[in-house]
């Protein structure tokens, strides 16, 4: 007897990618986000497109080039020769978070550009990491001469003074001034790959929530629950979206699960009431 195994769903595929932190495939996991919008997308083709960029870049850099020269070659190649840059005209277009679209249009937001930039930088042997800077994702490279922080939206390298200036609105809004001020270095800690993918998904989550696009928001929430299985806020948010879509049994399960875990949650009373309303509608 012969039988054909069905390929895994895009969600199951994503879940398999993000299961293990030790060998987390950042580029592949980030690229797979786009399968919600492009269900027939060939992720291996996306990875192949990045490999082609990597090969073109390698031809421009000698094997014995020092790290600083490699970094300069990457900046020239990525921003000037290939034309990658920030989408200043349509910053909130969901395609800015879909790597297949970013590769095609050469336009994205800081974090999607950073994922591509990091892949190319690491392919050159650079010690490059993502940085979850408040409000604007950054990348940094450790060189023998010191640390370089780059804005992936523009390709600009930022001085300490630039970074402090960019931080001021966040610090003032959070009351982190004077005696409560947080050292700059704490904002420049490496961002793990799992957190990078979570930030990409949360960008899409906010776009779809603002548009009240519940089906797309549910697709993003499904990924976040699998990516962050112990972040109970994501379970709650999926439950609320399910309720909006009329899937009350699944919503009941998620909201009850959230309340079972979030004893001290500030929204406990509101979610309890929402759960009561759902149960009344069910019974």
Give the positions of each predicted feature.
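A structural boundary/capping signal
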Residues: 1-283
């Amino acid at each position: 007897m012969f039988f054909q195994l069905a390929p895994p769903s895009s969600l199951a595929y994503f879940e398999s990618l993000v299961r293990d932190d030790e060998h987390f495939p950042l580029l592949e996991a980030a690229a797979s986000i786009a399968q919600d919008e492009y269900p027939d997308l060939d992720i291996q083709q996306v990875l192949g497109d990045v490999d082609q960029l990597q090969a073109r870049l390698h031809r421009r850099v000698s094997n014995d080039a020092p790290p600083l020269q490699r970094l300069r070659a990457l900046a020239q190649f990525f921003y000037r020769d290939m034309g990658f840059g920030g989408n200043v005209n349509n910053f909130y277009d969901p395609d800015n978070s879909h790597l297949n679209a970013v590769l095609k249009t050469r336009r994205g937001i800081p974090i999607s550009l950073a994922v591509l930039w990091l892949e190319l930088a690491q392919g050159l042997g650079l010690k490059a990491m993502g940085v979850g800077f408040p409000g604007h994702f950054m990348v940094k490279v450790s060189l023998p001469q010191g640390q370089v922080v780059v804005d992936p939206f523009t390709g600009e390298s930022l001085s300490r003074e630039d970074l402090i200036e960019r931080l001021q609105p966040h610090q003032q809004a959070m009351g982190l001034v004077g005696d409560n001020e947080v050292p700059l270095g704490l904002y420049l800690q490496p961002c793990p790959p799992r957190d990078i993918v979570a930030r990409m998904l949360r960008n899409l989550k906010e776009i779809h929530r603002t548009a009240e696009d519940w089906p797309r928001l549910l697709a993003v929430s499904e990924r976040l629950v699998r990516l962050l299985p112990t972040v109970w806020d994501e379970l709650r948010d999926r439950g609320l979206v399910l309720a909006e879509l009329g899937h009350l049994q699944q919503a009941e399960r998620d909201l009850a699960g959230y309340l079972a875990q979030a004893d001290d949650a500030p929204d406990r009373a509101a979610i309890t009431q929402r759960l009561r309303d759902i149960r009344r509608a069910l019974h």
